[in-house]
Amino acid sequence: MLITTTPSIEGKQIIEYKEVVFGEVVAGSNFIRDFFAGITDIIGGRSGAYESKIARARKEALEELQQQAKRLGANAVVGVEVNYTSINGEGKSMFMIVASGTAVVVR
């Protein structure tokens, strides 16, 4: 399945628009990891633990988006966007990744 951030696919013709599809992942992070990630940020390094977790969550969101498109009979998703949101409250720290795009049939 073709997945692209562009509104069209060069060399392909969109013959049917299905609907907007989403892939959503909410992932928690624990206090100890938050603490050490904060220290890493202060000294100017990169937080490998967070980067790895975000990469996995992004992959899951895109896979979910692709599965929704397949269920609709699409063979491509155009206009894909991936958004990241931090969710904090009640002593919990989480982040949400949402991938969205338009499921289409191309030939």
Swiss-Prot record:
UniProt xrefs under PANTHER family: UPF0145 PROTEIN YBJQ (PTHR34068:SF1)
Top-rank lineage group of the source organism: Bacteria
HAMAP family linked to this entry: UPF0145
Family of the protein in this entry: Belongs to the UPF0145 family.
Listed name of the protein: UPF0145 protein PM1668
SUPFAM superfamilies in the record: YbjQ-like
Coiled coil: none
Pfam family, one: YbjQ_1
Species assigned in the record: Pasteurella multocida (strain Pm70)
Alphabetical list of InterPro entries matching this protein: UPF0145_dom_sf, UPF0145_YbjQ-like
